[in-house]
Amino acid sequence: MTGIAELEKLRKEMASVTFEILRLCRRRNELAEKIAEIKMRLNLPVEDLSVEEDLKRRTLEICRSQDMDEDFCLKLLNLLIGESKRLQREKLKMKA
């Protein structure tokens, strides 16, 4: 396999992985909306810092075991948590 062919193959695989990540993000967003509905029924706030801290701890454990950059992992987690909170707040506003 030539260098160019190998490069193209790897780029194609990288694109595929990126698209799978986006599909998983969509699923995560769907779960956040369902969580918002339950929180609304139970009159619970959007934020639960103990849940966030536990997720952060578990995320760092996985990042370390996979030899990934912790800063990157935390930035990604914060982005995901921020989007979940945004969706939950939006859902709560719609029901108010």
Regions from the language model: what does each represent?
Residues 1-96:
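Domain-level signature for soluble enzymes in the chorismate/prephenate branch of the shikimate pathway
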